[in-house]
């Protein structure tokens, strides 16, 4: 008790005493004393050491506080009650219970499950009953069906009652014992220390119960006859006479023939010889009737282990000598009949002998052969015995030299006799091997020698490290592949059933179950439980003591001897041993996992996606539309079928370079043409057939075919002449067309002749067909010109051309592509989008839109602009592509080379506004021709409209505004170059000027050519014009009304405009960029057509 007082801790008090074992009102322990000393001594240590001690001390304090909190937690009564109710409910599952509710109702049923809940909100016990029924106290008879499931919640539950619960299986033998009696330690532990196996007793049937099938008959006195005929019985009982004949199901035997009689006599002789043989197999004896079932029990007859006979040995021998003793019926070694000694002093099994049926001559020669075989057998046995004795002596010498610790083997001492025999157990030799020779036949009588009691094998097991030593079986020794990889210490391994550990465990359990004695005599008559070098129980001479003489002494527990040996205790352990895995395997496995995790599965995922997409495409393809390419659904060779049935399968190739199949067709006629052949002279009728030919190897057949082809060609010519004169049916016309098409496609046509032996003209008509990709396709039938086309009906057959091969269709399409190739620099027409929205805000955007324009019916498109690629190269200027083909109207009078940015024109350019003063010193450029008679007239919408003489004349002639070209509004075309060089004055109302903020630099271009801007882009430099509202009567009021150009239309020839180059400003995109629409859509050396920029009434169709 003092020890517990010293360890007691008390936390409290506020006193400040400084003693070693004192505290503020509490006890102090030696542990605290040491802590205080360490805390005081920490001042003399280094800062690092003191810091380490403080951390360690803090960890100890945290652990102590956690333990105190766990000890100070109060006992929860609700938790304990919940545990008791859960245990009780689990014990009552499946019992018939009655549950009382708070309202007084009672439900009876089988308890299925319960739910217990505890908490601040309230706890309770819910019940679920199966096959429940509400209890009615008034009626004793049940009148209602049970409910399959009733759930009673905790708020309604009041009481549960279980009746008829059996608790006997929870009782133990100690509950029936008187509590006042004395109980020993062995009885308390329930184990007396002796491991005993249950003794097995054979099952014997009850003699009162009959096992015969005859006992089940209704009348036991009426026995079935020995020769019962089912046919005779059916005829008597039911009047049914059988028609059974054995010859229907088997081959008829001629029992009167000599062959049958000879074979029957030979078979009877062989059967008698086989039946008269003495066999050591109990199953054969039972089948032949030599052994009855009562002589042996089922364990001996049908068990896989034969427990009787000689001692089993476990030797890994390489040389075996044939046994000469007569094997017993329970022997586990199979011996052929030719190597058995039937005449033995000790009869093995009862046998029935009968003399064979042989002739005297045959019997005499048979006896002579047996005598010679007997002499040879004796000589061979003597030689074998001498060789075995020599081998045994050599083995003993080698074992004494190499393995002094192994047990010595004893050779069997045999008595002298005319014929000596070896041990039945096989002997082994590791140095030499001798072939085994057959022993004496069955009818030779020999005198056998008796062996001594010490009949043991001569082989020893060299593996001393095994847990069983010499007792180890050969199957276990084969498992020892390598000493480091053996899994004898691993329970639960794949080789657990055959591992040395499990074998040692079962062996030691068997040793403990047998009555043993500690002492071991020198003669080896008793068993000692003390192991020898951890190799089990072995005798002094190293032999396994499987059959030993037990002593009459009382059995004693071998536990002390087992506990003293660590190997035996380890073998008896039932715990799973942890396997030791080398570090190399662990690292390899971790590297493998890293490789698996780092694998890029993008390609695999993409492959799956492409596969699924291809699968969807294939599934949506129509059955009559073959797909060409790698993704086409090609059928397997087994799916290729013929739409027509052919009368012959023998085929030959008449045109090898073209195709391997030839279609042979002939027209059927009413007249018959006689033709004589060498094989058969008969009349032949030409019929319509289809034959698929193959290659034939015989030369004779080829010659015959050539002759037939010549005859067929002549017949074909005659038939054509007759077919021109007579009218034919629709089928004949179709065949002729097919013949013409086939002759044009280098296909050979032949006819087949069918012989008519019965003088009956029988014709078999088959359909024309070829191999096709779609087996479900319907044969194509061409439409007759003079007859109405058949209407398509909803049928399961498809209308697909199966006659024309798919290769011809593919080659025709490829041939057309080769004849009309597409240039690589030209964009296909289907890439041109004529309905692309135009730049409405840009008045000079006509040059950027290079797509074809769909003009209205009755309007003529503007003339195409010619292109001269050598013009600029001759003038010394780079070939550039202008942004617009005309100069803005405000800059037409500015000479080249003048900086427009320095000019400051007063006034504005608003319609109807003030004039613009032209700067002094500006000379108009040459080649700019002003329109004659131009007058600015206000339009209906208020916008200025310039009308010229030529335009007015065209309007008066055609009666349409804008002339026959219909370009009144828009038409940004340059003025026509006229041969006259005289400059005309502009009309008085035509005001010239420079727009403010133009900021353009005009290059020195050639005369009579449009200007090329090198500064900023015109749409950004020139201000956008202001468009007024459209005039009344025009649809699309929200559309802009474009201003007419201030210059006239071309009169004779359009102006030549270079279109090879392209003006690129400093801030414009590169020529190869995708945003450069001009470079992408306008190929070089091509013409451009510009649509009118005016408002069009059908503009909604194009925008």
Curated annotation (Swiss-Prot):
InterPro entries: ATXN2-like, LsmAD_domain, PAM2_motif, Sm, SM_dom_ATX. GO terms for biological process: stress granule assembly. GO terms for molecular function: mRNA binding. Residues 358-371, 695-741 have a biased composition (Basic and acidic residues). Pfam families: LsmAD (PF06741), PAM2 (PF07145), SM-ATX (PF14438). Residues 1-10 have a biased composition (Basic residues). Residues 33-44, 56-73, 312-356, 372-463, 530-544, 637-676, 683-694, 742-763, 930-957, 974-984, 1062-1076 have a biased composition (Low complexity). Residues 516-529 have a biased composition (Polar residues). One of its GO terms (cellular component) is cytoplasmic stress granule. Residues 1-75, 305-474, 516-557, 615-763, 901-920, 930-1103 are annotated as: Disordered. It comes from the Eukaryota. Residues 11-28, 960-969 have a biased composition (Gly residues). Residues 258-287, 366-403, 691-730 form a coiled coil. Residues 84-166 form the Sm domain. Residues 1020-1031 have a biased composition (Pro residues). Keywords: Coiled coil. PANTHER family: ATAXIN 2-RELATED, ATAXIN-2 HOMOLOG. Belongs to the ataxin-2 family. This is Ataxin-2 homolog. The gene is atxn2.
């Amino acid at each position: 008790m003092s020890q517990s007082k010293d360890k007691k801790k008390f936390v409290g008090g506020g006193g400040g005493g400084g003693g070693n074992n004192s505290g503020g009102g509490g006890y102090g322990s030696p542990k605290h004393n040491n802590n205080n000393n360490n805390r005081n001594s920490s001042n003399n240590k280094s800062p690092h050491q003191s810091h380490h001690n403080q951390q360690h001390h803090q960890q100890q304090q945290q652990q102590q506080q956690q333990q105190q909190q766990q000890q100070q937690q109060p006992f929860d009564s609700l938790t304990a009650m919940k545990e008791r109710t859960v245990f009780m409910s689990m014990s009552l599952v499946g019992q018939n219970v009655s549950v009382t509710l708070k309202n007084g109702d009672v439900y009876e049923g089988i308890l299925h499950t319960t739910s217990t809940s505890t908490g601040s909100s309230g706890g309770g016990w819910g019940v679920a009953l199966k096959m429940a029924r509400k209890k009615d106290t008034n009626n004793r008879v049940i009148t209602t069906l049970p409910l399959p499931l009733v759930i009673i919640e905790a708020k309604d539950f009041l009481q549960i009652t279980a009746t008829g619960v059996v608790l006997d299986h929870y009782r133990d033998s100690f509950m029936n014992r008187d509590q006042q009696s004395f109980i020993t330690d062995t009885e308390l532990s329930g184990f007396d220390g002796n491991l005993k196996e249950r003794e097995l007793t054979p099952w014997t049937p009850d003699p009162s119960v009959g096992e015969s099938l005859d006992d089940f008959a209704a009348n036991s006195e009426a026995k079935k006859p020995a020769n019962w005929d089912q046919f005779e019985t059916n005829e008597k009982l039911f009047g049914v006479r059988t028609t059974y004949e054995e010859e229907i199901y088997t081959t008829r035997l001629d029992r009167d023939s000599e062959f049958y009689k000879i074979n029957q006599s030979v078979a009877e002789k062989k059967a008698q010889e086989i039946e008269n043989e003495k066999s050591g197999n109990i199953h054969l004896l039972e089948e032949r009737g030599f052994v009855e079932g009562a002589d042996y029990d089922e364990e001996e007859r049908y068990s896989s282990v034969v427990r009787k006979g000689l001692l089993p040995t476990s030797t890994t021998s390489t040389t075996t000598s044939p046994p000469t003793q007569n094997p017993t019926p329970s022997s586990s070694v199979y011996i052929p009949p030719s190597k058995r000694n039937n005449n033995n002093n000790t009869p093995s099994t009862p046998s029935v002998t009968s003399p064979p049926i042989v002739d005297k001559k045959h019997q005499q020669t048979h006896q002579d052969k047996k005598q010679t075989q007997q002499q040879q057998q004796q000589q061979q046995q003597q030689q074998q015995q001498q060789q075995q004795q020599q081998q045994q002596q050599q083995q003993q010498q080698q074992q004494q030299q190499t393995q002094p610790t192994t047990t010595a083997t004893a050779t069997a001492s045999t008595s002298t006799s005319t014929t000596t025999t070896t041990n039945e157990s096989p002997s082994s030799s590791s140095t030499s091997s001798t072939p085994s020779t057959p022993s004496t036949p069955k009818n030779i009588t020999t005198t056998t020698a008796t062996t001594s009691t010490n009949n043991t094998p001569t082989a020893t097991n060299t593996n001393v490290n095994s847990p069983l030593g010499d007792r180890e079986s050969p199957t276990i020794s084969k498992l020892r592949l390598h000493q480091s990889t053996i899994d004898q210490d691993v329970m639960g391994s794949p080789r657990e059933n055959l591992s040395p550990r499990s074998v040692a465990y079962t062996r030691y359990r068997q040793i403990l179950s047998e009555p043993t004695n500690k002492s071991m005599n020198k003669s080896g008559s008793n068993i000692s439980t003390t192991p020898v070098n951890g190799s089990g129980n072995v005798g002094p001479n190293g032999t396994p003591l499987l059959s030993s003489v037990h002593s009459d002494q009382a059995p004693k527990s071998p536990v002390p001897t087992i506990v003293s040996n660590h190997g035996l205790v380890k073998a008896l352990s039932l715990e799973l041993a942890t396997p030791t895995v080398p570090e190399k395997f662990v690292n390899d496995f971790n590297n493998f996992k890293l490789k698996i995790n780092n694998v890029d599965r993008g390609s695999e995922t993409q492959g799956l996606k492409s596969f699924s997409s291809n699968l969807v495409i294939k599934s949506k393809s129509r059955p009559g539309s073959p797909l060409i390419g790698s993704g086409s659904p090609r059928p397997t060779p087994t799916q290729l079928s013929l739409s027509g049935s052919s009368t012959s399968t023998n085929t030959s190739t008449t045109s090898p370079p073209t195709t391997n199949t030839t279609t042979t067709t002939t027209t059927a006629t009413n007249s018959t043409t006689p033709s004589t052949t060498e094989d058969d002279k008969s009349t032949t009728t030409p019929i319509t057939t289809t034959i698929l030919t193959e290659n034939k190897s015989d030369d004779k057949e080829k010659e015959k075919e050539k002759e037939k082809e010549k005859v067929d060609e002549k017949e074909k010519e005659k038939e054509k002449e007759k077919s021109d004169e007579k009218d034919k049916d629709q089928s004949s016309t179709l065949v002729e067309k097919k013949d013409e098409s086939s002759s044009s496609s280098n296909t050979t046509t032949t006819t087949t002749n069918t012989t008519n032996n019965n003088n009956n003209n029988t014709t078999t008509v088959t359909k024309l067909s070829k191999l096709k990709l779609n087996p479900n396709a319907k044969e194509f039938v061409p439409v007759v010109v003079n007859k109405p086309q058949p209407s398509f009906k909803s049928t399961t057959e498809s209308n697909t051309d199966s006659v024309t091969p798919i290769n011809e269709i593919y080659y025709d399409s490829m041939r057309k592509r080769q004849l009309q190739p597409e240039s690589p620099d030209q964009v296909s027409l289907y890439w041109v989008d004529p309905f692309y929205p135009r730049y409405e805000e840009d008045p000079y955007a006509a040059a950027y839109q290079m797509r074809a324009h769909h003009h209205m019916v009755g309007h003529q498109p503007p003339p195409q602009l010619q292109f001269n690629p050598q013009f600029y190269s001759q003038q010394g200027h780079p070939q550039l592509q202008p942004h617009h083909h005309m100069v803005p109207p405000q800059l037409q009078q500015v000479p080249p080379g003048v900086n427009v940015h320095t000019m400051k024109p007063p006034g504005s350019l608003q319609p109807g506004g003030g004039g613009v003063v032209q700067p002094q010193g500006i000379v108009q450029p040459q080649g700019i021709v002003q329109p004659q008679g131009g007058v600015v007239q206000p339009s209906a919408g208020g916008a200025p409209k310039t009308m010229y003489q030529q335009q007015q004349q065209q309007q008066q002639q055609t009666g349409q505004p804008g002339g026959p070209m219909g370009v009144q509004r828009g038409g940004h075309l340059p003025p026509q170059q006229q041969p006259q060089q005289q400059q005309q004055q502009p009309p008085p109302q035509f005001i010239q000027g420079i727009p403010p903020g133009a900021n353009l630099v005009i290059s020195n271009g050639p005369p009579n050519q449009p200007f090329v801007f090198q500064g900023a882009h015109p749409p950004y430099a020139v201000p956008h014009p202001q468009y007024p509202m459209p005039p009344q009567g025009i649809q699309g009021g929200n559309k802009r009304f474009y201003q007419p150009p201030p210059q006239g239309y071309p009169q004779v020839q359009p102006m030549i405009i270079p279109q090879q180059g392209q003006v690129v400003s400093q801030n414009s995109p590169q020529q190869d960029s995708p945003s450069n629409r001009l470079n992408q859509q306008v190929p070089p050396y091509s013409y451009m057509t510009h649509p009118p920029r005016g408002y069009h009434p059908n503009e909604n169709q194009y925008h």
